[in-house]
Amino acid sequence: MEIRKSAVAGTLESSDVQIMLSAGNNGIEFELVSDVAKQFGDAIKETITDVLNTYGVTDAAVSVVDKGALDMVIRARAIAVVQRALDIVDTPNWEVL
């Protein structure tokens, strides 16, 4: 699916993650800011990429600011930002969830 508008989900509070999503041109491009990027950066990217793939998003610019979020929080924020960017908040795809 094609991203219709830029979107943000999450906060900059401790134990949360803020994900910003906008249209991209060359696949999925990440910008990750995290104190634990060396240890968990690949896992964070994998979780977000999994959500993007589930919704059929192939081109996106993803900016992530992690403040120690657990995987379930990252996944929930990723789902929220993708639904906002695809403008399907009012009609969620329950099979994806």
Curated annotation (Swiss-Prot):
Annotated Pfam families: ACP (PF06857)
Signal sequence extent: none
InterPro entries assigned: CitD, Mal_deCO2ase/Cit_lyase_ACP
Gene designation per UniProt: citD
Keywords assigned: Cytoplasm, Phosphoprotein
Compartment list: Cytoplasm
Residues modified as O-(phosphoribosyl dephospho-coenzyme A)serine: S14
Function: Covalent carrier of the coenzyme of citrate lyase.
Family membership noted in the UniProt record: Belongs to the CitD family.
HAMAP family in alphabetical order: CitD (MF_00805)
Main localization category: cytoplasm
Protein name: Citrate lyase acyl carrier protein
Organism: Weissella paramesenteroides
Subunit structure: Oligomer with a subunit composition of (alpha,beta,gamma)6.
Any one cellular-component term (Gene Ontology): cytoplasm
